[in-house]
Amino acid sequence: MKTTYKEIREIEEINLLIEQGNATLKELGYTEHSKKHAAKVSDTAGKILTELGYGKHKIELARIAGYMHDIGNSINRHDHAHSGALLAYQILKDTEMSLKDVLVIMTAIGHHDEATGDAVDPVSAALILADKTDVRRNRVQNPVPATDRKSVV
């Protein structure tokens, strides 16, 4: 792996996708899915694999997947894991990352949503757990539930 988590966080396209997804979800009444959430999930996924004794390489893959996991929200909340996996592939294939590593990250992102995914490997398992543990109260962006917003808008 030549491309690092630190470098991934500096890629403008990724950050814009995260910001667009968060703006869209805010309008729909969802909790915050900003770069702060992405960084928190990334950090937690890395810590999970560290605690379980995985090597630095796999930990770095989990951190990258954690940061990028919600980029699919920029397209649509429905099926965001799958569209996010495809976006991640398109972005990461143009980095210095090996195709094998790109596919591990793509798979983890594609499987992180509990409705459509499964823990198919350590990176995807860490990502699923990390995403679900970010339950900060300040993630609430809109006090009107998404189901009630149509009558408000």
Model segments located where?
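Histidine/acidic-rich helix-loop-helix segments that form or flank divalent-metal centers
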Residues: 98-149
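Inter-helical turn/loop segments and adjacent helix faces that build the functional surface
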Residues: 52, 95-99
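Acidic/His-rich, divalent-metal-binding segments that scaffold phosphate/diphosphate chemistry
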Residues: 1-80
